[in-house]
């Protein structure tokens, strides 16, 4: 009972309509730069690229997959650092250097025999709009560009790279009644 109260307090700001849309979701897809990261790119003197990721975002991926969700990324930039992170998280799929994300998503859904209504997508910028306006549940981080925030179903209070992916995952699990049992089962294992 205590866990339920904690989860309810944690997600109390999420509108009920968002939870209703989340009930039909089977796939969580994210952009990377500006969602899994804060959008910054660091380079060293040799041109090596560095990005900072939030470990809380990564931790939930395997639990989503165990709960039956597919998890993936479609990103506009091609970057070995991003590919490495997607592999490390064991995403079911990840596409890099994609300029037409809606076309790529449509091709992907056709092979998976899924519909747009079964997709939750996290994006933060202009390149994400064609997807965000057509999927079953669209989510943006707090620091997404204003016209993206205006177009999505839910704007998280969290910024890119600060746990927005984790919140979206928790939201999906909670909408399907799986977050509280997950927390309680893990708490019992550690007791």
What residues fall within each predicted segment?
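Substrate-recognition element of Asp-dependent hydrolases with the DxDx(T/V) motif
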Residues: 61-85, 95, 132
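Mg2+-dependent phosphoryl-transfer enzymes with acidic/Ser/Thr/Gly-rich catalytic loops
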Residues: 50-51, 87-89, 93-95, 102-191
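Short coil/turn segments at beta-strand junctions that form active-site/ligand-binding loops
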Residues: 24-26, 69, 117-118
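Asp-based phosphoryl-transfer active-site loop
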Residues: 23-41, 132, 165
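Short, acidic loop-to-helix structural element flanking the phosphoryl-transfer center
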Residues: 50-67, 102-106
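Short secondary-structure boundary segments
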Residues: 32, 76, 98, 142-145
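Non-catalytic pre-domain segments flanking phosphatase-related domains
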Residues: 1-30, 178-191
């Amino acid at each position: 009972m205590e866990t339920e109260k904690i989860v309810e307090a944690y997600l109390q700001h999420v509108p009920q309509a968002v939870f209703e849309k989340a009930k039909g979701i089977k796939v969580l897809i994210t952009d990377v730069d500006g969602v899994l990261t804060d959008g910054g790119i660091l380079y060293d003197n040799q041109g090596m690229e560095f990005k900072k990721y939030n470990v809380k975002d990564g931790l939930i991926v395997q639990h989503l997959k165990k709960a039956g969700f597919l998890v993936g990324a479609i990103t506009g930039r091609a970057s070995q650092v991003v590919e490495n992170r997607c592999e490390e998280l064991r995403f079911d799929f990840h596409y890099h250097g994609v300029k037409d994300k809606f076309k790529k998503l449509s091709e992907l859904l056709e092979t998976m025999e899924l519909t747009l209504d079964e997709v939750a997508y996290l994006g933060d910028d202009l390149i994400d709009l064609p997807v965000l306006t057509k999927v079953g549940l669209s989510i943006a981080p707090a620091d997404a560009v204003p016209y993206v925030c205006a177009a999505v179903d839910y704007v998280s209070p969290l910024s890119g790279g600060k746990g927005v992916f984790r919140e979206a995952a928790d939201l999906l699990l909670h909408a399907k009644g799986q977050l509280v049992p997950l927390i309680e089962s893990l708490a019992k294992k550690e007791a």
